[in-house]
Amino acid sequence: MKGFYMYYLGIILASVIGYFLGSISWSIIIVKKVGNIDIRTVGSGNPGATNTVRTLGKKWGLVVAFLDALKVVFTAIVAILLSMIPNDLFSQTSYFIPCIFALIGHCYPIYYKFKGGKAVSCFLGLLFVVNVLYLIIFLIIWFISVAISRKVSVASMFSALIILLIMWIPYLSGVSYFIWEWNGLEKFRVAWKNYILFSLLNSFHYWFSNTWASGILEGNIIILIGGLILAWRHSQNIKRIKNKTEPDTFPKKVKPVR
């Protein structure tokens, strides 16, 4: 039995904790607390940051987005703490894999009958954990896309698609060629020694003098899974976009006729 769990107990524990953290719906909690409204009964009915904007305004929508992203980051911190336990069962605890379970918990929360958000804010948290540079690129593309389309759904899906394409460029991870090995410690070592910390949290493996760190391939697979979940959660939006019935999240202000 120990052979099965060898090296992976930390991943399993962090993933379970991540799912329960991800299942906390900040939009439901905050909208109920601030406006005494069940967010699932107003607007799009989706318990997420965008519907919070529609219900309470941009300020509270930003708060919800930040807290939802933080669920993924906290999950990574749990994994980091577990990896520091001086035991083989925790020595290869991935900081990436548990984070996808936080995203799944956000979309399918056990506390709310498995009906949750659309993964965008948690996807931002996932990008921060895997590669900060991906997060910066996503946000730049997102803001430009929102300004053009006025639709958060379009901006989110388009930005995620761009990340899924460019993440295969090795230089964006601070290395000169793609790392196919599951253990990325040796290949990342030079980049981290030179303080090229695009993969900021992953570098904690190095600073803790560990013998293992997640490779680029693992991070990309996790981002790919997160991107596919994001697209799946936007399936109804995609249908409305095709039918040209998707409403603007931020409608253009019409100047009054004088």
UniProtKB/Swiss-Prot annotation:
Gene Ontology terms: biological process: phospholipid biosynthetic process
Keywords linked to the UniProt accession: Cell membrane, Lipid biosynthesis, Lipid metabolism, Membrane, Phospholipid biosynthesis, Phospholipid metabolism, Transferase, Transmembrane, Transmembrane helix
GO cellular component: plasma membrane
Chief location: membrane
E.C. no: 2.3.1.275
Lineage: superkingdom: Bacteria
Cystines in this chain: none
Entry's Gene Ontology molecular function annotations: acyl-phosphate glycerol-3-phosphate acyltransferase activity
Pathway annotation from the record: Lipid metabolism; phospholipid metabolism
Localization (cell): Cell membrane
Oligomer and partners: Probably interacts with PlsX.
Annotated family: Belongs to the PlsY family.
Function: Catalyzes the transfer of an acyl group from acyl-phosphate (acyl-PO(4)) to glycerol-3-phosphate (G3P) to form lysophosphatidic acid (LPA). This enzyme utilizes acyl-phosphate as fatty acyl donor, but not acyl-CoA or acyl-ACP.
NCBIfam families: glycerol-3-phosphate 1-O-acyltransferase PlsY, PRK14399.1
Protein name stated in the entry: Glycerol-3-phosphate acyltransferase
Lineage of producing organism: Bacteria, Bacillati, Mycoplasmatota, Mollicutes, Mycoplasmataceae
